[in-house]
Amino acid sequence: MLSAQERAHITQVWDLIAGHEAPFGAELLRRLFTVYPSTKVYFRHLGDHPDEVQLLSHGQRMLQAVGVAVQYMDNLRAVLSPLADLHAQVLRVDPTNFPLVIQCFQVVLASHLQGEFTVEMQAAWDKFLTGVAVVLTEKYR
């Protein structure tokens, strides 16, 4: 459960990056593929060497989903249920990869927002994104 202050931190950070989902998402994917190359197996549709347009497109979709989660943080299960079904039943993404995505996204936030991304904001985002990952893994059986 997020506190009022944590919710405020999440919303404040999202307001700073909203509208920039594509470049932030592309950078997240580049970092993910560089640091954790084994994750590329879940992005076969991007090919072995995805071009910038592919990264921007998929990165935008990923972060738009995060934006929806931010908008409906009180109702994550209902909002993310279709995405959880997709990842568990269709894409069959190993849920151990979600923390890797979370880590890379937080690095992207920190590198762009620098001093604006405080320790408290990072902690709130870590808690929030971990909650998102929990919801996404609930459909695995």
From Swiss-Prot:
One of its GO terms (molecular function) is oxygen carrier activity. Pfam families: Globin (PF00042). One of its GO terms (biological process) is cellular oxidant detoxification. One of its GO terms (cellular component) is haptoglobin-hemoglobin complex. InterPro entries: Globin, Globin-like_sf, Globin/Proto, Hemoglobin_a-typ, Hemoglobin_oxygen_transport. Keywords: Heme, Iron, Metal-binding, Oxygen transport, Transport. Residues 1-141 form the Globin domain. The keyword Iron applies. It comes from the Eukaryota. Heme b binds at H58, H87. Belongs to the globin family. This is Hemoglobin subunit mu. It comes from Bos taurus.
